[in-house]
């Protein structure tokens, strides 16, 4: 593990406790609450076909090959500890008794981005909240974490909105059962140059994302003994420009937007029926898997003559349907299906991602609160714009040991 990365983590943790110490003298009578928690998990995985080797430890339909042999011959085994997690959360008192600062810092070992395929520190949460204001990295308001089913695959259903990112959040309305929040979140556009790479390779190579404005998100949530309902919304500027050209032309932007409705219903005492539907344009970067935010679109005359090429915010639909069944205190099963459907533009490559499907069933054994083991079977399929598809069946067996300690001062 790189020394600089370890140093950053230790500095962040020490900063939290430094604040604690600094405040201690002024507000010695106040209560401090900390929880240290986490788990060690090992996942044994076998694929009957092949996925992108950088993603052997997470089941993502977008990483399934649609051309036989792309990632080698069929069959692959992996054993991973990347899901293992460590976190610290708690509350710090504030002078003049104006309410606590609640904080959370959490990491796992699942490398993504430039670290994809590696077992390395990955920041999940790093935020603090005082009153109505939250600052830091956590789940997007566009996301509904309560629709995440009881699965052991790290990545989970493809059709979910699932994104953690830096943000500034305001919650003007909050009760014991409901809240309404708005936020500005870090922009991150995913642009597909498509067939522009073929008829103008230089332009295709020089196109880049342009992120001049933050993303604007909002969320309304309510719950009861029956379950919960959440509606999330997003409005964003999805822009592009060119590197090394006069005035960075061509350049431009489109408006991205989306609505995400999620809910679960409590049935048979402990069971849950889970559902989520999301639709929008230019929202793929917020999805759990697959798609692109912006792609080129050509306009033709009825005679087939090209009039112009312009950018288009790509439409996308995501669906999740799962059932969490608790047979008794020790045994449980989660079964369900999810999809992501993209409405490709006419200038995306034939091999561009069009649809991802994901289905799974498991049987989990929890003999004690901090021990879990079980197996899961997953099926996934990727379909490209040219309707060529590839599929994979995965078997996973996992063992997880959890730990935690509460400290009150």
What are these regions (language model features)?
Residues 223-353, 409:
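Detector for outer-membrane/organellar transmembrane beta-barrel domains
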Residues 123-125, 165-167, 213-217, 254-262, ...:
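Transmembrane beta-barrel architecture of outer membranes
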Residues 390-409:
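Outer-membrane beta-barrel "beta-signal"
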Residues 1-28, 407-409:
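Cleavable N-terminal export/targeting peptides
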Residues 359-376:
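C-terminal closing repeat unit and adjoining cap/tail of repeat-based domains
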Residues 47, 93-95, 110-114, 140-144, ...:
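Sequence/structural signature of outer-membrane beta-barrel proteins
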Residues 27-56, 62-192, 210-228, 264-268, ...:
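Outer membrane beta-barrel
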